[in-house]
From Swiss-Prot:
Alphabetical list of InterPro entries matching this protein: RING-CH-type_E3_ubiq-ligase, Znf_RING-CH, Znf_RING/FYVE/PHD
Gene for this chain: Marchf7
Superkingdom to which the source organism belongs: Eukaryota
Residues that bear Phosphoserine: 318, 389, 688
Designated name of the protein: E3 ubiquitin-protein ligase MARCHF7
Length: 692
C-alpha cells in the first residue's frame, strides 16, 4: 500500500565524512515514525582517497571492514539501486555511509539480501519495527579496543576477528530510541529544532568542508563515538568532526542535518513559531468574537438587565477620575501593546460590553486620549470608543437597535411622560438640578458594572454629546422620563467639555428621588382606612364568638347542633371535657365493645375513672356487650371445629399409610361423614341458644 503524499516534498543531499558518496534521498512524508526505516546502503564505493587515508592508519579495522563491504559485484549494485528506486517512492529512507545503521521493516528482505558481507546476515537482524540498529558502529568501537591490544596480529587475524565478532547477537547492539508515533500519543522533544532543520535542509546541500577524511585513529574514534552515541539527538554537540544525527520532525519526516545548523538556528525558530501561534490564536478568537457579537446582545435583554440592575443597586454612584497621568500612562501603554492587543481587543470587546443600550448611542469621536484610556482599563464599556473595523463590522446591529428604539418611541406617546428634573451628581458631591425633558436629552448612557475578575472597581462610561442631540434620540425613546446621574471628575469643576470621560447612570422612572430611596420605599402598602376597620371588626367578632360559644363536645369539639343530638354529662369530668354529644357517646361505646373490652371497662370513664351514667334512647350497653360476646364464642367454636376436622383427617391419612390399607373411596366417605356430624352438632348448639 502506498503511503500518503507529502505536504512539502523534500530533497536532501548529504555529504558525510570519509568521501564516501551518499545517495540523494528523496523523502516523502510517512504516516508515522515507525514506518520510516533506515535502509542500509549496499552500494558502497571506495575511492582512492579513502584507500590512501585508511592505509596510513596501521592495523586499522577500517581496512578489513570497508574492503569486505566494497567487494560487491556490479550486478548486486544495480539490483540494489533498482530496489532502492522502487522503495524511494513508497517511504523515506536514509543512507549514511558512516553509520550504515540497519532496521527491520517492510523492506528488510530487499535491502539486506544484496549485502555480501558475511558478518551481516538477514536472519540476525531482529524483526522489531520500532528499533534502529546501530550494530556496525558499536561493533567498530569494540573492535578498535580489542585490536589496540593486538597490533602485532596479521590482517588474517583481523578478518577472523571480524567474523567472530559478527557472531554476537544483533539485539545486543540495539540502540534505545523511543518511537515517535502520533498513534501512540508521543511527540518528539526537539519539535522546534527539528522542524527548522527540515526547512533549512530542503533542496540544499551540506557544505563541502564536511568531506574531510579521518586520518588518525583518535579522530576516527571520536567521530564514531559521536556518530553512535546512545541518544543520537544530542550528537550535534560534538563539533570537532561532522556528526550527522537522525532527527524526527513534527511531521515525522526523517532528515539528516548538520550540528552547526541546528545549534545556530534553534532559538530564532522558537520565537518565530511562538509568534505565529499567537497570531493564529488571535485570528481565530477574532473570528469567533465577530460571529458571536451579533447574537449575544439584544435590545430586550438589555432593557431587562437594566431594570433589574437599577432596582437592585440603591444610591449607586460610580466615580470616574481621569487625570493627565492616567492618560499619559494609557497612551504609552497602548503604543507599546498596540500590535499585540489590537486583534485580541477587537475579538474580546464584546465580552466587556456590560450593557447593550450603550450601543444605541455611538459616539463616533476619535480622540486618542479616550481610545488609550479605553485600552488601559479592562472593565470598561467599549461602545463609544469602538474601533473602526469593529464598528463597520457591527453596522447592521447598530442600525437595527436604532430602528427598534424609534419603534419603541413611536409606541409611547409623549403626553404620557411627565417632565422630570434630571439630577447630575458630581464626584465632589455638588448637586445640580437641570430641568429637561426625557426626549430632548441626547446623552449616551450605560449602566456601569464592576469587573470582579480584574479587581477594577471603576465602571464603564460614555462621553456625552450634547451638541449632537439628534444622533442619540433612540435612548430617549426607550427610557422616557428617566433620571440620569452623571459622575464628573472633581478636577474639572463645572466645565463639561466634549473630551471628558464621565459615567452616566440611568435611573428608571419608578425612582422618586436621588437619595437612594427606591420605589419600594415609596410604594409602601397604604391600605384604605375602611378596609382596615373591617378587618379589625372581623377579628373582634371572631374573639367574641369564641367567648360566646359556651359548651362544646369533648369528642367532636362542636356545640349542640340540633335537639336530637344534645350535649350530656356522662361523668364527673369538668371544663372542656364535661359535655359530649349523645351520638358521639354511642359511637365511642360501640367501638369499645367491638374491640373486645370487658363490660366494666366499657362503662367506666377513661379520664375520671367514674361509672358512666348513661340514659341513652335505643342503646342498651349490656345487651350490646352480650351479643358481641356470643358472636365471639361462635367464631371461636367454628374455628376450633375446623381445626379439629383437619387434624383428624391428617391423623387418619397417616394411620392408613402406616397400616398399608389405604383405600381412597373409603377415606373420602369417612371425611364426608365427619363433616356432616360436625355440621349437625353446630345446628344443635344454635337451637339450644335460641331456646335460652
Amino acid at each position: 500500500m502506498e503511503s500518503k503524499p507529502s505536504r512539502i516534498p523534500r530533497r536532501i543531499s548529504v555529504q558525510p565524512s570519509g568521501s564516501l558518496s551518499a545517495r540523494m534521498v528523496s523523502g516523502n512524508r510517512g504516516t508515522s515514525l515507525n514506518d520510516s526505516y533506515h535502509s542500509r546502503d549496499s552500494s558502497f564505493r571506495l575511492d582512492s582517497e579513502y584507500q590512501s587515508a585508511s592505509a596510513s592508519a596501521s592495523a586499522s579495522p577500517y581496512q578489513s571492514t570497508w574492503y569486505s563491504e566494497s567487494e560487491i559485484t556490479q550486478g548486486a549494485r544495480s539490483r540494489s539501486q533498482n530496489q532502492q528506486r522502487d522503495h524511494d517512492s513508497k517511504r523515506p529512507k536514509l543512507s549514511c555511509t558512516n553509520c550504515t545503521s540497519t532496521s527491520a521493516g517492510r523492506n528488510i528482505g530487499s535491502g539486506l539480501n544484496t549485502l555480501s558481507d558475511s558478518s551481516w546476515r538477514p536472519g540476525q537482524v531482529p524483526r522489531s519495527s520500532s528499533m534502529v540498529l546501530g550494530s556496525f558502529g558499536t561493533d567498530l568501537m569494540r573492535e578498535r579496543r580489542d585490536l589496540e591490544r593486538r597490533r602485532d596480529s596479521s590482517i588474517s587475524s583481523l578478518m577472523d576477528y571480524s567474523h567472530r565478532s559478527g557472531d554476537f547477537t544483533a539485539p545486543a547492539y540495539v540502540q534505545e530510541r523511543v518511537p515517535s508515533s502520533y498513534s501512540q500519543g508521543a511527540r518528539p522533544k526537539e519539535n522546534a529544532a527539528n522542524t527548522l532543520q527540515l526547512n533549512s535542509s530542503t533542496n540544499h546541500q551540506l557544505p563541502s568542508e564536511h568531506q574531510t577524511v579521518p586520518s588518525s585513529r583518535d579522530s576516527s574514534r571520536s567521530s564514531f563515538r559521536s556518530h553512535f552515541s546512545p541518544r543520537q539527538s544530542e550528537s550535534f554537540r560534538n563539533s570537532s568532526h561532522p556528526a550527522f544525527s537522525y532527527l524526527s520532525s513534527r511531521n515525522e519526516t526523517p532528515t539528516i542535518s548538520s550540528s552547526e545548523r541546528a545549534g545556530s538556528s534553534q532559538r530564532p525558530f522558537q520565537e518565530s513559531s511562538d509568534n505565529e501561534g499567537r497570531r493564529t490564536t488571535r485570528r481565530l478568537l477574532s473570528r469567533i468574537a465577530s460571529s458571536m457579537s451579533s447574537t449575544f446582545f439584544s435590545r430586550r435583554s438589555s432593557q431587562d438587565s437594566l431594570n433589574t440592575r437599577s432596582l437592585s443597586s440603591e444610591n449607586y454612584i460610580s466615580p470616574r477620575t481621569l487625570t493627565s497621568q492616567s492618560r499619559n500612562n494609557g497612551a504609552s501603554s497602548s503604543e507599546v501593546n498596540d500590535g499585540r492587543a489590537s486583534e485580541a481587543s477587537q475579538g474580546f470587546r464584546f465580552l466587556r460590553r456590560r450593557w447593550g443600550l450603550s450601543s444605541l448611542s455611538q459616539n463616533h469621536s476619535s480622540e486618542p486620549d479616550a481610545e488609550n484610556f479605553n485600552q488601559e482599563s479592562e472593565g470598561r464599556n467599549t461602545g463609544p470608543w469602538l474601533s473602526s473595523s469593529l464598528r463597520n463590522r457591527c453596522t447592521p446591529l447598530f442600525s437595527r437597535r436604532r430602528r427598534e428604539g424609534r419603534d419603541e418611541s413611536s409606541r409611547i406617546s409623549p403626553s404620557d411622560v411627565p417632565p422630570r428634573s434630571h439630577l447630575f451628581r458630581r464626584e465632589s458631591n455638588e448637586v445640580v438640578h437641570l430641568e429637561a425633558q426625557g426626549d430632548s436629552l441626547g446623552a449616551a448612557a450605560s449602566r456601569p458594572q464592576a469587573s470582579g475578575a480584574s479587581g477594577n472597581a471603576s465602571a464603564s462610561g460614555s462621553t456625552p454629546d450634547l451638541p449632537q442631540g439628534g444622533r442619540n434620540t433612540g435612548i430617549a425613546g426607550i427610557l422616557p422620563g428617566s433620571l440620569f446621574r452623571f459622575a464628573v471628575p472633581p478636577a474639572l469643576g463645572s466645565n463639561l467639555t466634549d473630551n471628558v470621560t464621565i459615567t452616566v447612570d440611568i435611573i428608571p422612572s419608578g425612582w422618586s428621588s436621588a437619595d437612594g430611596k427606591s420605589e419600594k420605599a415609596k410604594s409602601a402598602p397604604s391600605r384604605d382606612p375602611e378596609k382596615l376597620q373591617k378587618i379589625k371588626e372581623s377579628l373582634l367578632l371572631e374573639d367574641s364568638d369564641e367567648e360566646e360559644e359556651g359548651d362544646l363536645c369533648r369528642i367532636c369539639q362542636m356545640a349542640a347542633a340540633s335537639s336530637s343530638n344534645l350535649l350530656i354529662e356522662p361523668c364527673k369530668c369538668t371544663g372542656s371535657l364535661q359535655y359530649v354529644h349523645q351520638e358521639c357517646m354511642k359511637k365511642w361505646l360501640q367501638a369499645k365493645i367491638n374491640s373486645g373490652s370487658s363490660l366494666e371497662a366499657v362503662t367506666t370513664c377513661e379520664l375520671c375513672k367514674e361509672k358512666l351514667q348513661l340514659n341513652l334512647e335505643d342503646f342498651d350497653i349490656h345487651e350490646l356487650h352480650r351479643a358481641h360476646a356470643n358472636e365471639q364464642a361462635e367464631y371461636e367454636f367454628i374455628s376450633s371445629g375446623l381445626y379439629l376436622v383437619v387434624l383428624l383427617h391428617l391423623c387418619e391419612q397417616s394411620f392408613s399409610d402406616m397400616m398399608g390399607n389405604t383405600i381412597e373411596p373409603s377415606t373420602r366417605v369417612r371425611f364426608i361423614n365427619l363433616a356432616r356430624t360436625l355440621q349437625a352438632h353446630m345446628e344443635d348448639l344454635e337451637t339450644s341458644e335460641d331456646e335460652f
